[in-house]
Amino acid sequence: IDLLNRWYGCKKIPIGATTREKNSTMSHVKNFTEVVCQMKDEKGRPLYKQLPEGKENWQDAVMLHRQLLAKSDDHSVTIISVGFSNNLSALLASQPDGFSPMNGKELVAKKVDRLVVMAGHMENPNYKEFNVINDVPACQKVYDEWPTPIYTSPFELGEKILYPARSIKED
């Protein structure tokens, strides 16, 4: 996300680090972010400028969600999730803190207008979609307990959206 933000000149968008991956069943899969950051051009140079600071310096994703939601107007936030559900599940379970006297579910209900999630496969219920199977309990918690409308962009929609890498590089 940071890489894309910087690519498009949006350098000040804060990035939270995932620290809650206890239920992940996909620890053997290489981190997608690392794969993208290691991409090279035809001359063997990094395709993207590397991060100025390591992930260890990023704020915890749940705390960042709480901080940003607490500052937001009521029902003004659209959250778009294009990955696993563990951060959103942990946000729902979060307790009051210095950012807000509300628990996570209350804070989401007050500040979030909708959640848009890239997950699942509607045409084939037996398909093991990557964003879901990585942490099934977290995904179930989000779909069961999220207090605002959820809009799902399923696998079969995403697989039809082909975007040329050349355009990302040149446009």
Predicted regions: what they are:
Residues 1-171:
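N-terminal acidic, glycine/proline-rich low-complexity segments
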